[in-house]
Amino acid sequence: MSAAADVIVLSSSPDRIPNGSPVLPAHDPAKLFDLSPPSASPSPVRSPSELFQISTRSRFFELETPSRNKENKTPKEPPVRKVNTTSKAKSASSQDKPKRRGRKPASESQTVLGDSGLAGLAQQSAPKKTAGARKKRVDSEGKRGKATNRTIMGRVAKSGNVQAKPPQEKIMDVSTPNALPPTKPASGVVSLEIDGLQLETAMKRRIDWTPTKDTTARTVESSQQEVAEANPQSFGSLLSEYGFNDISSAQSDVRNLGDDGPTKRRRIELVDSRLFGSSKPASHDIDDKNLTEDSQQKQPEPKQKPKKQTKKFTTLTARVTASYLNNSHEGSDSSSKETTTSRENAATSRTRGSKRKGKATSKPKEPEFIVLSPEAAAKSLENQELIFGTCSQLEREDSPTSLKELQAAISESERYAVAEPSPLSSTLCATPTSRFTTARGLWSVAARDLEGSLIRQTEVVDLVDTPEPAKMTTSTNDSRNEKALEDAATVPPKEPFDLPQSEPPKLKAIPAAKKEPSPAPGLPTIKASDNLKGTTSQHSKPQPKMPNYNGFTDAELSRQVASYGFKPVKNRKAMIDLLQKCWVSKHGKGTTFETQAGSQNTSTEPTPVLTSSEPNTSQKQPRKTATSRKTAAKSKTNPDSNPPPKINSRKTPSSSDATKAPSIQSKPTQPPPIQSLSNVEEIEDSEEETLPSPFRIQNRYTPQPPETRQALPVSKTLYSPSRPKPRTTKSTTNNSATLNQKQPDLADQIFKAMHAQPAGTPSRPSWHEKILMYDPIILEDFATWLNTEGLGLVGEDREVSAAFLRKWCESRGICCCYR
């Protein structure tokens, strides 16, 4: 007793002594183990070895006490084990003492039970129970060993279900070690083996410790059951949607069912679609009545809506997307509900035969425009005026006059835009049949088709059937295009048709006449030239013919030049060109048709080149004179063509009103022949510097006075119109022509001077060869050569500055730079 008390006193706490003086200290060491919970956790691992002898009994004793006191279950176990082990060791030393010691711990265990919470039990009743319990324990010791194993299993369960039994078992546990200590270890071995199996079950307990899995699984299962209960009703509604039965009320019901679900996923539309399905078979009949009533009231409205939409169908895209417009509006507008109800009526009609007929009659009206038969679709497209491009994306009201008005406005704008540049484009149109094809710059090729002729917008105007806007445009463009029409080769053939006036028609007939001798003019050009022949022949009969200056001697040529008031020219070709120009300016082009034919025969290279296409005569004259050095025919034809537009500019103001109106009226007929007639660049391969500059090309498409246009034609520079020549003193027309030709003559003189220069060597190429090789021309050196030697070869007394040469080079696309 004393030894046991000493052990208990060491581990006891003074606070709990008053409850039971001998027992409380035994309970306190358990609290000390409570202070170290990690020791309690490994203790069950150690249990197989420790329980092998006596610890199992102590466990049974402890388990029963903490079962009532859940707070101190684990801590009470190890201290009792220690006390039992000490008592067992002492019992082994002396067999008489263990009975007493067994009694004392039993009383202690009873006090522990009273401490753990059994306040109703008295300390006196406890010893009585212990006596009865001792006898029972002695009777069944082996059974108690098995029971201990059973209690261990119960310990693994530790649910606290049985609390009254453990106090009795504890008393028996204390008595059992006293009876048979040697036999208990054998039974303890068996119990340890069983304990090992029970440890596996403990691991299962630990798996069960995670409450979230059990709770989530249970809640999900319960929610799934609820959803399953809701699904049988909503499943039919899903099928109803496949039948295009859309009910706003059904949707709201389904949403409510989705809200009942525990998880948010029940609210997802996909889950809602499942919920829709079950309601159809169950409440399909009820829904049918509501649907039919709603559909009968709302069916006329969707009929009106497609009509509104059809009014907007003016484009291909609207036609194609017409069948999908209802679906798009259903989601956004309240009208969608009406359309859906009509569809639902059609679906419900399938279930009921009588309703099917009524709904089928109302529904086919929608698919008529939604889905058309191939024939009906083709007819609808044929009846519709289609606009392609960006306009097809626009929705406009269907009006038969709107498209016509649009076309009329476009035609007027095209006529208005084309009327001004038309003479330029006609003059710049090149015939693919010309003898000489020159390498053209990128900007000159840009505005031409595959055949080399200019792309013209007048053809687009011809396609329009409305002649009235053309008349309006011609009248408005008369004032603007007076000079343009005078300079354009398109106008001259038109004027001789309508008005056979003395000089202007003669001058304008010349380009067509020149176009005939061209080696291979187009068919339309031949027709125009034939018409011009009849008109020009009438005028040319009374007028003298141009003499063949090629047959004159140098002395005769110099006299003729002096007669026109020009200084003597050294170069024979230059004199012939000058005389031809002067004679044409004096007598008119109408007489030069035959003489030009003769001169072209005598000339080395006859060409229909830019003559017809040169409304800007001042520019083309110098260019053609430059070409005449290599080809006399070019220079001869060029002077003929150059003065007539100039004379037209002089003479047309007098008769411009009479001549221009008829010419404008005849424009739509003539432009195509002009395109074939005009050869934009009739220049040899060596004359690439005369290619049109980008500035000229811009001027081609912008109507300008003849002075600015002189830069536009392929052959001439911008600067040619600025310098007039006062050499022609015999007639005002000659003076005006020479004034306009003076600067072009200077540019042509520069061009001629380059060709007059003898061919250079590879080490020192001529200026013309440098230009052909795209070598940069140093302006100072070029000006020095022209002023000292080059212009002298041509008989030009004037001098040229570097700035002028820079403009001259830039106008022809020649690479130049300052030193």
From Swiss-Prot:
Forms a heterodimer with slx1. It holds the Pfam family Slx4. One of its GO terms (biological process) is DNA repair. Belongs to the SLX4 family. Regulatory subunit of the slx1-slx4 structure-specific endonuclease that resolves DNA secondary structures generated during DNA repair and recombination. Has endonuclease activity towards branched DNA substrates, introducing single-strand cuts in duplex DNA close to junctions with ss-DNA. Phosphorylated in response to DNA damage. Residues 36-49 have a biased composition (Low complexity). Residues 83-95, 212-237, 313-329, 337-351, 532-541, 592-620, 650-668, 729-741 have a biased composition (Polar residues). This is Structure-specific endonuclease subunit slx4. It comes from Aspergillus flavus (strain ATCC 200026 / FGSC A1120 / IAM 13836 / NRRL 3357 / JCM 12722 / SRRC 167). GO terms for molecular function: 5'-flap endonuclease activity.
